[in-house]
Amino acid sequence: MDGLGPHGETIMDYSIYDAIRSGFGKVVFVIRKDFEDDFRSKILSKYQGHIPVEVVFQSTDALPKGFSCPEGRTKPWGTNHAVLMGKDAIKEPFAVINADDFYGRNTFEVMAAELSRPRDRKGDYCMVAFYVGNTMSEGGTVSRGVCHEKNGFLDTVVERTDIGYAADGTIEFTDENGNKQKLAPETPVSMNMWGFTTDYFDYSEKAFVEFLKENIDKPKAEYFIPSVVNQMINSGLATVRVLKTSSKWFGVTYANDRPVVVAKFAELHASGEYPEKMF
């Protein structure tokens, strides 16, 4: 956890601070078991008295009955496997985020408002989409899940790689045929901020079994959130409302992103968006 703020704050510190002031009431961390002692002493302790926290563990051998991790597999099973690890700790509507992405206050506010809405059916989910122009790295190209939507609901997420600035300042990516294609700056993309209700765990467990049947012996295969969401949408089992945010994403994708991020956090503190001491 790299300290990037003026007083050594991590990106996760900002996310948790924004979540608290947006109305979230608990944080569940998904970590490796061998990281537990350091995590509890160096990271968790600072949140004490600010918000309830729980820790769950992701490991390669956390598999359904009838499956065992192939010898030599070291790669985690993916983002949706990490979500599944939280099943016993989560009993209410919840948001999923990456610990190393800065999402911004507005993102948590729109997510909290949507998750607070009464629901009368299963599969009523949401996600926050960023404008791709607000997610670029000055250090190089990025990969993003481009969101295709209909009437405000997600139709599909298509992973696009090699997204960067062209010589004329426009945004482009490399398609599956190796050709450069333009992306409008306001194109919505997923930064892995999803909003689910607990029925998502039930479908995910069943889908994980099917994933393992096909991929158990593939050492690099991963069980990703967008894959499961796409399955549920295509099967008519879920709708995913696409929420928009005015926030600008940033993170340390490349080493030369770090000074840029440090400067941005300094500006946010100087402007009063964040207090001198958050925790």
Annotate each language-model stretch with its function.
Residues 205-238:
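A C-terminal functional module that forms or caps the active site or interfaces directly
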Residues 47-93:
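Short phosphate-binding loop-to-helix
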Residues 1, 146-149, 242:
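A structural signal for short hydrophobic beta-strand segments in well-ordered beta-sheet cores
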Residues 39-43, 111, 204, 261:
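Hydrophobic packing residues within well-ordered alpha-helices of enzyme cores
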